[in-house]
Amino acid sequence: DIYGSGMSETVFGDAFASDPSLHREDVLIQSKCGIRQGCYDLSKEHILESVDGILKRLQTDYLDLLLLHRPDALVEPEEVAAAFDVLFESGKVRHFGVSNHKPMQIALLQKYVRQPLVVNQVQFSIPVSNLVANGMEVNMETPGSVDHDGSLLDYCRLHDITLQAWSPFQMPSWKGCFLGSDEYPELNQKIRVLAEKYGVSDTTIAAAWILRHPANMQLVTGTASEKRLKEIIAACNITLTREEWYELYLAAVSYTHLRAHETAANL
């Protein structure tokens, strides 16, 4: 409910309502709540008010999935549970999840919430890959060995929580898209080779890298280009080999580690 101050949902709702060929039961609609100007807010009152606003803007009676956008340091799990009960029993929300939450934060919520938390949406791309790096670089003195997120990937797989990857084409530190960027020449060269091999675009290969992971992740991305959307969808039909997956990972992580060492040396 913060994107464009809700305008994104208004535009989507208007577009959906204007096309009689679209049927609500054929579309899965997901939204988030929990951020207000200047603070995070997972209180019962804010969650309920947010969902009512979301439904009004989307011109629909229910959400298929509601996510708690970010952890609220002042969260009272009992309030979240009470809000979820109201939303579920009223039919306004069918499924629930979180975004950018660590395992213990999820476990704390799930202790009180009766409905299963089925999604955790986190940042993940080839260059932003700590989600998998800390699992491979165990007992190493490398940047990737630092577990910032408490074995998040393993926890979600153990508890049947679907991971959604946001900003799947993003570089670290919000520097923009890595595809075609001079920041990652080796990675982009290897992506182009694979794109030619499979007869697809660079975008398709970058998306296929995420989908190749056995956690069965989902991509969360936005575009104003129908062509690019089709390129992303095409990734569902590409299965990179194990060697190709690691080749792309190493091309990105070697650059990221180099930057980290340079930064540390300059401190």
Task: Outline where the language-model segments fall.
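Acidic-and-aromatic substrate-binding clefts and catalytic sites of carbohydrate-active enzymes
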Residues: 1-11, 36-41, 72-76, 103-104, ...
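N-terminal binding-site loop/beta-alpha segment at the start of enzyme catalytic domains
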Residues: 1-27, 89, 172
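A short, structured active-site edge motif that brings together acidic residues
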Residues: 25-37, 122-126
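Short, acidic/polar
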Residues: 43-57
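Active-site groove signature of glycoside hydrolases
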Residues: 58-74
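Beta/alpha (TIM)-barrel catalytic core signal, keyed to glycine-rich beta->alpha loops juxtaposed to Asp/Glu
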Residues: 71, 75-251
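Conserved small/polar residues in nucleotide/adenosyl-binding loops
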Residues: 256-263
